[in-house]
Amino acid sequence: MVVAAGSKFNLRRGNSGSCSSHNNVVINDRDGGEFSRRNKSGCFSSMVEVDKDPSCVSFTTFNILAPIYKRIDPQNQGVRESDCRSFWLARNQRILDSLLSESSSIMCLQEFWVGNEELVHMYEERLGDAGYQLFKLARTNNRGDGLLTAIRKDHLSIVNYRELLFNDCGDRVAQLLHVQSVNPILQNQKDSLNQEFLIVNTHLLFPHDSSLSIVRLDQVYQILQYVELYQRENRLKPMPIILCGDWNGSKRGHVYKFLRSQGFVSSYDIANQYTDSYADAHKWVSHRNHRGNICGVDFIWLYNPNQARKPMKTSWAEAVFSILKFQLRKASLSEDDAFTFLKGDNCTDSVTYISFSEALRKVKLIGVPYGLCFQQLQDLWNQADVDGNGVIDFEEFKQKIWNSTCSEHVCMEDSNPEQEQEAIGFKVKNAMLFPREMEKGLWPEDYSLSDHARLTCVFSPAKMSCSSL
């Protein structure tokens, strides 16, 4: 992992030529504008909400589908929108119209075409003129796209900005911003208080293969580790953490469950009173992928400082064991067969470190460029070997691997009131997807602004008590 602050990138100019006509190309869009409806909580659009209450903060996350990836001719899959300047220019103007009509406090965009100077300038000019400060980050290895985070300067000021480069097989990156409100949220004759919080914008690897689950989990693990390191090194007081982006995984996935075990909640689900149950897992969608499948993958995660969280390494190990179990069940192995598989050629009725390592190699969790490193393997083994006797017996296997779940709910431990302090967190006031059909689990066929929905959430400040430790 390489962490870089304020890196500079050379932007490449894309094809600026006009495009000849292509058959079966749909360019009409449900551009949308301001939200003109209420949801069940009775809230209006984010812009209206923040104007009514300046202490509110609104977030928008949107994968805007880079022109280098957008296919525009069903008869010729090799033709991309980046080949047709008039197409990508018009679509991105409509994207900007949509974003500016919403006018959120924070915009987190993914698949931003950093490799095209004209498009970059268009976003810088229009968002800059609207009062936004922009932060761009290209994916590694000159992939062409990256992230863009825009902050409204009349709402928020930047305390710090950091960049996280995973340097993995997906060339993924993340942005970390430490911001505070421009106007005090609490004020009296003696002092005033400005709200501070941390924002992450990222775009996780697409799970082209189930073996890539370990990479996606590691990306999230690195993000949380880096956020924790930043908080510790800067001796920050307890504050909310918001993770925005395209997570390329649904509510049933390992990443979702890992984040839930770390105290994060999906803002959209909270606003709509959806649970983690299977029945609520498919109530909404936000993406139609290149395979034609629709699912909900775009999230604005909220962690409040009063939330309990498991030790991160424990949650991570539970998630890896869950991935291991999935791979074993994918091979149609029963509980007994799975234990035998982990034992390998070992004659005793237990799993040794060597046989455990070999089993993980066979299911592609180690021994591949994107697999677990040596230290991670050691950490995993230490979690599984409960009694520390150097082997995993059948009971430990059942407890830690076969019957283990990445618990999505963490109970608050008893705390000492003398060790508590007051903090300012966030309350979810509203959250909306556009187009609206996606809130019903439907994908509108005439929507072509992107292959993702735009997700916007509105938060209001809330006092809460949290541990000072």
Question: What are the functions of these language-model segments?
Answer:
Residues 70-75, 120-122, 145-147, 174, ...:
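Short aromatic-enriched loop/helix-cap "lid" or pocket-rim segments at secondary-structure transitions
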